[in-house]
């Protein structure tokens, strides 16, 4: 007898057929530029499958199956939820419930992500009356199968109950709340293509409120209604098409619903659009720039449309409040409104005047839809002649020099694309992502964030944030010079070459064209050239060395330049990412500022006088602590000049008070306290020195989730290590006072052990670091005096990295004299001062460098 092949179960057969049909549609989409046909085809295929299941389950003709939400629009992304409503007549047999459950279960078995509700007409209206999400999903309801009469009765009741004004207010509030979750910016590193500001949800919201108001349900209908122009309708369709296509491609690449443009998928998504990497830009950076421009346009046009719809739904009871510029601008209900639609065509210089008035006029909270539209449609007016017009140059400088409102004005100029059309080089960096692992903003947003930070120094209500910066800027004449420097400090990013040098040339040209002369022009250009210098000196050089301070003072040359560079540096670091700035970096910069200011004021950077001053200050503090006179000598006699220069008087006094009775201790002494500088723990270690000591301490910190910010390593004349560490806990909301005792006990016990150094843990990289790894670099060279060797390490940050470095050095018996741990978001740029013994051997140098590269490799 011949064996027969068993038929697959009907459910499996249906699922296989549906999956094959969907796969065929997706295969066609891969070579298509437009996604709308795919979305409609997926919706039709889903309709057909659901109709078939409905009939198979024997559901009566008195019920109706209704598509809602995006499915109701007839648009399905490859892995979108399929939202359905089973509409029941007021009275129905209870046995229907079992059939409906079977229908929904079979839909799930088919592979559909079903979102279902089962309601009567009355229940639908009741739910919609107190839940705007339900009300919205029903707005685009579409019958798939079942009773037409029941569906039409439902839609009639729904429209009768719909209050267009209340719906508008609810959806606008919902949109504001949604935007707030994304920090009110489309410029996220990993934007949500659907939900982020400028995403698909904004476009859908506009069409929802327009449909509810009876104004139309497509961009063409809104154009016909006069709510948007032909040009705006084209822009909306173009950007909507791009966002829909991007979302669908994310779904296909991920093989599931995926609306967030995560790092891991950005390169594949870019390649699916045909972007190719160049020497200057990754493919992903090109895609992200396209996305940011689309989101920016959507945000701009959405603002115009919402204001226009609001004006029709809520006709103004009052007209013009006051004339702000005769024949050009008026204030209308708190908004800056053009006096006529062709103002910018007749008076191109009114374009920048609009922002000056917005900035300088109390009570004006924004630009009206009419003004925004006129700006949007005046792009051709903003040409070379407009940029060269002396009136515009004068107005631009006035905007920079106003006492308040500068940040808001520049943000609005960027949102409306006016800033990029006035400064063409600024336009080149709009939407340009920086995959350097520590900037979390696009270049244009970073620049405006730096401008905002400098402005906040000068605002009294923010003086508590950075008191020293606020104190300095109060006495800084013509602070607008700093704003110009902020605008240009990174304007040349992404062009290739040294962005500081290229930006210098742009800044010099701007100053020449805008009448900035003499010392002010020289300061702007110098700040752009050296905007990274102070940070590098403070974080990577030994600022206890008088030679370093003297060299930096010679570069700066004057107190005004020093203050300007300090303020720009603090604002710049704070403008890269919320994670990069910390109080320790603030202390390093402030210490460098004060030391340099003393030299500029005539003080000689003399090690002997500095040593004497610090010792006297430390002794005064010890007397307050009731430490016996001369008790400090036993310890201080064992310390070299370098120790006193590398520690301030407060640290010297604390360490002396802890150690003066234990100068010849047999066991390790470990003391910890909350850092006086800020949110960190200061750890003192005093123990007989050995070659693996630094590595052993780093191993303990690594195993216990403590990150080292700074290490100052000293060896006494009688062979003890006196090491000082500043560490932070990776967990949030840690109370350092609570963990100080635990660190003291555990670290002392660890140092008492004679166990070999453990293997470093290769901690996991973040997704950002995995997607955009940097090439690790190691540079080992003798310092200028030949006293120490300077080791510079640049790598992706990860747990265990510092210990991996320390272990290699310990294995080669290379002593660490000092360490500056500089974490910049997802990357580190660490600098170590090493004892030079043995490193003069080139073979050892090469071996150490090679092993370090291997240890820090991703």
From Swiss-Prot:
Residues 325-681 are annotated as: Uridylyl-removing. InterPro entries: ACT-like_dom_sf (IPR045865), ACT_dom (IPR002912), HD/PDEase_dom (IPR003607), HD_domain (IPR006674), NT_sf (IPR043519), PII_UdlTrfase/GS_AdlTrfase (IPR013546), Polymerase_NTP_transf_dom (IPR002934), UTase/UR (IPR010043). Its EC number is 2.7.7.59, 3.1.4.-. It comes from the Bacteria. Its cofactor is Mg(2+). It holds the Pfam family GlnD_UR_UTase. Residues 1-324 are annotated as: Uridylyltransferase. One of its GO terms (biological process) is regulation of nitrogen utilization. The keyword Repeat applies. The keyword Repeat applies. SUPFAM superfamilies: ACT-like, HD-domain/PDEase-like, Nucleotidyltransferase, Nucleotidyltransferase substrate binding subunit/domain. Residues 682-761, 790-858 form the ACT domain. It catalyses: [protein-PII]-L-tyrosine + UTP = [protein-PII]-uridylyl-L-tyrosine + diphosphate; [protein-PII]-uridylyl-L-tyrosine + H2O = [protein-PII]-L-tyrosine + UMP + H(+). This is Bifunctional uridylyltransferase/uridylyl-removing enzyme. It comes from Burkholderia mallei (strain ATCC 23344). The gene is glnD.
